[in-house]
A protein has these predicted regions:
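Regulatory loop-to-helix N-cap segments in sensory/regulatory domains
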Residues: 130, 136-152, 162-165
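… and, occasionally, acidic/histidine-rich disordered N-termini of signaling adaptors
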Residues: 169-198
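Signal-transmission/dimerization alpha-helices at domain junctions
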Residues: 1-2, 15, 87-90, 126, ...
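Regulatory sensory and allosteric helical modules in signal-transduction proteins
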Residues: 65-101, 105, 109-111
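A short, aliphatic-rich beta-strand micro-motif
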Residues: 116-124
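Flexible loop/coil segments at beta-strand boundaries within sensory signal-transduction domains
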Residues: 51-52, 124-129, 138
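Helix-loop-beta substructure at the N-terminus of cytosolic sensory domains
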Residues: 15-58, 66-69, 191, 198
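Signal-transmission linkers at sensory-effector interfaces
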Residues: 1-27, 35, 164-178
Length: 198
């Protein structure tokens, strides 16, 4: 006889097995994080384009409008983010009001939306920088070492989801490009169309 008690535990991360969108999975991860750390009001991702040096706001999990929707900037024009890469370590700002340089647009936008603390984790794929993960809170001084130790696990898990998504897109683009090369030999017009689509 099967004992139902053996199956009583619910896997809090079972959403990772779903085939939903990356945003849906990040929102689900945010819900799991908030069960433990209610003060995490927003998780956001920026992606880095190595060819252009541009960071682009990609997605966020917050309930309100994204303060950085459609925002992009050269990494070279974001010295505090560039410093994260130089040091190879995440950045913790426990009180955004204390930031001396409020001249950057992204800092002003985050502040206007009521975020008081920020944790920024760089994301890598096999050693290559791919973007940043931001965890924001409306409360100051919440990112203690104990909290950060646990948030690192969630942060790296989300980074792996992003890496997986990027790999799938690159694979699809490579397949379309290969198909275009084959099609060029048989039908140049269709091959040119596939080149434009990839």
């Amino acid at each position: 006889m099967i004992n139902d008690e053996n199956f009583a535990h619910r896997d809090n991360l079972d959403f990772l097995n779903d085939s939903g969108s990356l945003r849906g999975r990040v929102v689900a991860a945010h819900h799991v994080v908030r069960r433990r750390f209610e003060f995490i009001a927003r998780i956001a991702l920026t992606l880095y384009d190595a060819e252009t040096g541009v960071l682009k706001a990609y997605l966020h999990s917050g309930p309100q409008d994204d303060p950085l929707e459609h925002y992009q900037a050269l990494l070279d024009n974001a010295p505090s983010l560039k410093e994260i890469l130089k040091r190879g370590r995440p950045r913790v700002i426990n009180n955004l009001v204390t930031i001396q340089d409020q001249s950057h647009e992204h800092t002003r936008r985050i502040g206007r939306h009521g975020y008081a603390a920020s944790y920024t984790l760089p994301m890598f794929n096999n050693g290559d920088f791919i973007g940043f993960l931001f965890l924001n809170s409306p409360e100051a001084n919440v990112f203690t070492e104990d909290v950060l130790e646990q948030l690192d696990i969630y942060g790296h898990l989300i980074a792996l989801m992003v890496t997986s998504e990027i790999a799938a897109v690159h694979t699809l683009a490579a397949m379309v490009k290969a198909t275009g090369h084959i099609t060029h030999h048989r039908d140049p017009e269709t091959g040119s169309h596939l080149d434009r689509m990839s």
